[in-house]
């Protein structure tokens, strides 16, 4: 029996959100393991960062090669590593500005709900957004590194706000990709990875903004 277009969209959305929820749960577990001292806290942050970057490429390669079992395992490992990577940041704000953590989490969830509702309840077409959002993201990353290395007089709050707008746009765009089924043969795992990165980055940006207010 042939599925209708709506059934296909819902199936892909449910699978994508399932992978996203699992990934976020594993990340929360990674944060807990670090804060609880189960994992050594003296491991350099850049080691987790390099491992995470390598895993992103590995997930994309294995998913595109249709090795879904390995890709799923790598996504789980990546999610835990990402939790260990962001754990020191979360731990700091839990001590210095605990309200900021809750506000950042609620804000991120709210943005995701709004993005999903707008994309799925309207006929909005975001096909042209991709290149501009990617360009804006690269610009934000370059400015961030330049500010860090050359100590440029750039407002960190303004930079955070700019990157926040970019990731809000990426969240809308990635939900549109799910609806339009554009991710290398409708791969729910890769779509979930994109939305996961949107979620984590938005959470960290909002955490920085709310933390400054406190």
Question: What is the predicted role of each segment?
Answer:
Residues 1-214:
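A hydrophobic alpha-helical transmembrane-helix feature that marks the membrane cores
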